[in-house]
Amino acid sequence: VTEYRVGTGFDTHALEEGVPLVLGGVRIDFPRGLAGHSDGDVLAHALTDAVLGAAGLEDIGALFPPGDPALAGADSLELLAKAWERVRIHGWTLANADVVLIGEEPRLAPHRAEMRRRLASALDVDPDLVAVRATTTDGLGFTGRGEGLAAQAVALLVR
């Protein structure tokens, strides 16, 4: 019997001056970056929580505690890959994933293909299995005011 599981993930970080902006593992030329203990990559963080949740495992904060000095400035794609290994040990494979950036800017279109490639590489899957999209909140809320960015992700696992 084939078993399917769905997981969701959500992450948000404040935008901060003097910090590089990394989204989907791609460094983007932008005047502000995402504050966080790691590189603040909300796309990778949301996807990490989605795959962990689908497998019924702990969340990203339990697996990689934000206060752990060893994780300061960590590459979020490496964290995603480590989390994915825990998921794979339980026999799961990725059917597909969908990751959405929520914010007014930056525009993702010029970077989308590379983000898909890098997120998929961390999961050791074909980029066709990982969708990367963006939406705005039409100026509403903290993302609409440009105070931060958010991301949500859905992952479907199969075994």
Task: Go through each PLM region and give its residues.
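C-terminal edge-of-domain segments
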Residues: 145-159
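Pyridoxal 5′-phosphate
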Residues: 132-136
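RNase III-family endoribonuclease catalytic core
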Residues: 2-118, 122-123
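Short acidic capping loops at alpha-helix termini that bridge into adjacent secondary structure
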Residues: 126-129
